[in-house]
Every structure is written in structure tokens, then in C-alpha cells.
């Protein structure tokens, strides 16, 4: 907003002052000196030697930052070698990936990188992350906060991988026809893609307890596989939630919930099919809705669209906190499970699913003529409705969002007649 822009402008102005620039240069030079001392401890480097940075990938951001400094320090060449390389911007640096654009198109690399956080988790060490270097080059690490069970999972996975690498040749009666670099790469990518995109039940159980370290100077972690969160997202937001970029390992979550949907979304991503959530809105359910303010009321018919698992989502515009909405579920079905009632800005609904749910607030529904059977399951009379008063003190056009599962749907013609 306006305040954020003001703070950003002030921050940039402060950075441009001679005093701050000099301080940044001095600290940067000091850090570079400590880091090169650390590198020298790891391997004897002579003038003119090539320094090679080896990492999982995937953009080579560290190399982007230190390439010039390392080259000046050694007077030699700097190279980066990665498992997967997909640069966000072309850097023109010496970078190569075991898997990169020489072998696969950008869409394939994006698919692999979307769920690649699991590889990061399996590759971390029990030692804490390096946050600085001492004057002699020794690393300064933050405290290791990982749980013992995480370490156990990593140990099992690594032990198995090393054992496989040592004994992999024993599985062949004779060498395969494509036993060259390209053939081995093809096999490796196939195995990696299967793990990242179509994990089996045993792998899902192995990954279930892992948490992803956010890094960025914080100790925050996110659940790597959040099946309950993904299921709720599908129920409330449908495919739009499944396509959300906020999920760390979406293929694993969808594979556990709905393998057919997972495979369909993977196919669309692989072939670059530009499918939007609105393209998949079919078999909508007409719902009569009463909109009323202090002076008048009217009845309209709105369409609730399927999300997942038999649930529907109905959006009811209520203006700038103007209208009370009466959703006449009794005209739609004799029974209904109400999963969620929220109020949010209309503008938020045009953005990503993460933006949509970030600013929504719980509604205050009144269940008129609806008898509770069990938890969120209600029996509805023909005149039953959910009444949602408008929220107070919210600016901009608002809308009520109701997620429900009708049971025993009434014929659509009867619904239209009732409206």
C-alpha cells in the first residue's frame, strides 16, 4: 500500500547516501575475505586454478553473486555444476546441469523443480546452516533445529541411495543398449520424475513428517506434505487451490487424495496447456439467494460451482457491506454439509488462491430452519436458509463465500420455479 511504498522509497534513499555505501562496501569486502579463507581451508587453490561450485541447483543464485569475486581472487575460471539447472534469467556464466535445457525443454524442468524441495530435505546435514565466517575462515553455524525423526528419514534414504549406486551394475545380465551418458541420464530423469510427480504410498509415508526449512534468515519451517491442508484447499477452492504456487510438494498431496486429478494437472503442465480454473467450471448448481438491506429485498439465482469431493462453492456479492444474504439451501437439497462460510473482498477473488484466502474472514452464519444432524451436517426444510449478515468496517465490494455439499439434490427445474 501507500505506507509500504513510502518506506521502500525512504530505504532506497538511505542506501544511496555516501556513508551507507561506504559501510556496505567495507562489510562486503570483509565478508568476501573471510569466505575466501574458508574456501582455502577446504582445498589448496593456486593462482589461475578453476573453482567449481557444485550444488543441487536450480538457478545457481550463489554463483551469480560470487562469480566475479572468486574469479578476481584466484585469477582463474569459475564454473558451476548442478543436478538440475533452470536459470530464471540467462546469466552467461559457466553453468551446466546433469539435467538442463540441453536435454529437456523449460516446461519439463519447471515440472521437476516444482516439487524438488524433497531433494533439498534429503540432502541437508545435521549441522546448522552457515550464517557467517570467522576471521580465520571457520564457518559460524546457527543451531541445528531439525527433529531426530527427520534425521532418521534422511539416513534411511541416503543409505539406500549409496547402496544402490554401489550395486547398480549387479542387476544387469548384460549392459543395456543405451549404457552411455544420455542413456543413464534418461533413466535417472525417469526415476526422479516418478518420485517427484507420482510418489507411491511408501514414499508418501516417508515424506509425511518432513518439514521444509524456509531459510531467508529465519528459523521458520513449513510442512512439506500437508495432505489435510491440500484436501481443505480442494474442497474450498477446487482446481484453483491445487494449482497454487504456495504448496511445496503438490504432486505428493494430490497423489494421495486424487491420483486422476494429479495426472491430469501434470499432463497440462507438461504440454503447456493454459487451463484456468474457470475453464473447468461445469455442472453448476443453481441456488436461490435473497439479498436484503434496510429498505428492500430481492431474490436472485446464482450458480454454485463444483470444487472437489462433492462440494460446491457459491459466491454471493453483497456490495460494500450492504446486503444480508439468505442462501436458500432448502430449495436445493433436503440435506447439506456446510464446510465453510467466509467474507472477502471481491478484488481478492481475481488473484491467486493464496491471495484469496489470505484476507478472508469467517462469516457469521445463522442457520434458519436447519436442524443439526452431526457436526456440519444439516437437515433442511423447503424454506431453510443460511443467513449471513454483512460484515462491518470493511472497505470495497465484498462477497460471501459458502462451501457446501448437497445431499439428495432437488431437480433443477424445481429450484428455478422456487426462485
What feature does the model see in each segment?
Residues 294-319, 361-378:
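Extracellular carbohydrate recognition and processing domains
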Residues 49-53, 323-327, 400:
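Generic beta-sheet signal
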Residues 314-337:
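Extracellular beta-strand ligand-recognition surfaces/modules
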Residues 271-288, 349-419:
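Activation corresponds to long, low-complexity, non-globular regions
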Residues 1-288, 406-418:
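Long, low-complexity, Lys/Arg-enriched
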Residues 145-151, 155, 159, 306, ...:
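Mixed-charge (acidic/basic) macromolecular-recognition segments
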Residues 43-49, 317-321, 393-396:
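Flexible, charged surface loops at secondary-structure boundaries
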Amino acid at each position: 500500500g501507500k505506507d509500504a511504498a513510502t518506506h521502500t522509497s525512504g530505504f532506497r534513499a538511505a542506501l544511496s547516501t555516501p556513508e551507507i555505501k561506504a559501510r556496505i562496501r567495507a562489510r562486503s569486502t570483509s565478508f568476501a575475505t573471510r569466505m575466501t579463507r574458508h574456501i582455502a581451508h577446504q582445498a589448496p587453490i593456486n593462482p589461475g586454478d578453476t573453482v567449481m561450485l557444485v550444488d543441487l541447483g536450480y538457478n545457481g543464485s550463489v554463483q551469480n553473486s560470487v562469480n566475479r569475486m572468486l574469479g578476481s581472487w584466484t585469477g582463474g575460471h569459475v564454473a558451476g555444476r548442478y543436478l538440475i539447472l533452470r536459470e530464471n534469467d540467462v546469466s552467461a556464466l559457466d553453468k551446466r546441469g546433469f539435467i538442463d535445457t540441453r536435454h529437456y525443454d523449460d516446461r519439463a524442468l519447471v515440472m521437476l523443480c516444482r516439487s524438488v524441495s524433497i531433494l533439498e530435505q534429503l540432502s541437508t546435514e545435521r549441522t546448522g546452516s552457515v550464517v557467517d565466517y570467522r576471521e580465520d575462515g571457520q564457518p559460524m553455524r546457527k543451531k541445528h533445529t531439525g527433529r531426530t525423526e527427520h534425521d532418521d528419514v534422511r539416513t534411511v534414504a541416503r543409505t539406500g541411495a549409496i547402496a544402490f549406486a554401489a550395486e547398480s551394475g549387479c542387476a544387469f545380465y548384460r549392459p543395456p543398449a543405451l549404457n552411455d551418458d544420455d542413456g543413464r541420464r534418461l533413466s535417472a530423469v525417469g526415476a526422479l520424475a516418478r518420485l517427484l510427480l507420482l510418489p507411491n504410498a511408501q514414499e508418501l509415508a516417508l515424506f509425511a513428517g518432513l518439514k521444509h526449512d524456509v531459510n531467508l534468515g529465519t528459523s521458520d519451517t513449513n510442512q512439506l506434505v500437508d495432505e489435510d491442508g491440500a484436501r481443505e484447499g480442494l474442497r474450498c477452492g477446487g482446481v484453483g487451490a491445487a494449482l497454487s504456487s504456495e504448496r511445496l510438494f503438490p504432486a505428493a498431496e494430490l497423489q494421495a487424495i486424487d491420483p486422476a486429478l494429479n495426472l491430469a494437472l501434470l499432463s497440462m503442465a507438461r504440454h503447456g496447456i493454459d487451463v484456468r480454473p474457470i475453464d473447468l467450471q461445469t455442472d453448476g448448481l443453481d441456488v436461490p439467494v435473497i439479498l436484503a438491506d434496510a429498505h428492500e429485498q430481492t431474490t436472485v439465482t446464482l450458480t454454485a460451482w463444483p470444487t472437489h469431493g462433492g462440494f460446491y462453492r457459491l459466491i454471493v456479492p453483497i456490495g460494500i457491506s450492504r446486503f444480508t444474504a439468505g442462501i436458500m439451501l432448502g430449495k436445493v437439497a433436503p440435506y447439506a454439509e456446510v464446510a465453510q462460510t467466509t467474507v472477502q473482498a471481491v478484488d481478492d477473488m481475481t488473484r491467486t488462491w493464496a491471495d484469496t484466502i489470505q484476507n478472508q474472514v469467517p462469516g457469521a452464519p445463522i442457520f434458519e430452519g436447519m436442524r443439526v444432524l452431526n457436526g456440519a451436517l444439516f437437515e433442511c426444510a423447503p424454506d431453510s436458509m443460511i443467513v449471513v449478515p454483512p460484515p462491518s468496517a470493511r472497505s470495497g465490494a465484498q462477497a460471501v463465500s459458502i462451501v457446501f455439499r448437497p445431499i439428495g439434490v432437488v431437480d433443477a427445474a424445481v429450484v428455478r420455479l422456487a426462485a
